[in-house]
């Protein structure tokens, strides 16, 4: 058993959320540095503003790319958007929604501002698209999934739900 099991976390292990948020908003990725570029893994882009791999600039660019993709492929249904409990989820949500709104995308988001697990977004997309051949929905989840608490993530879900 870990020696800290059942005990409050020591201050040195706690995340400095204001520092993280400042780095998210103020960070300017260097496009020459591959570690700071937008990089999609198995399910979206993940990284940390502390190393320049997840900043507002990343989210703005990814969100605009999603809008461009929707326009190019004729996706006109709603975009289901969810977030998790990671510290950067809410700042990244604001960045993403600004881009989606500026592009006239119909956004479906939890009305109470709550957290939305990834499978809920997938289910919403599949339920909405069932029996449709046009006006299909897709989705975004602001989450780094299982990554460390200082990370952020931006996942895109196609009209097939994943």
Regions found by a protein language model. Give the residues of each.
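Metal-dependent DNA phosphodiester-chemistry modules and their immediately adjacent helices/loops
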Residues: 149-162
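N-terminal small/polar loop signature for handling phosphorylated ligands or for N-terminal nucleophile
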Residues: 72-150
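An N-terminal, well-structured beta->alpha segment
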Residues: 1-98, 133
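Phosphate-binding chemistry for phosphorylated carbohydrates and sugar-nucleotides
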Residues: 11-14, 19, 23-26, 103-115, ...
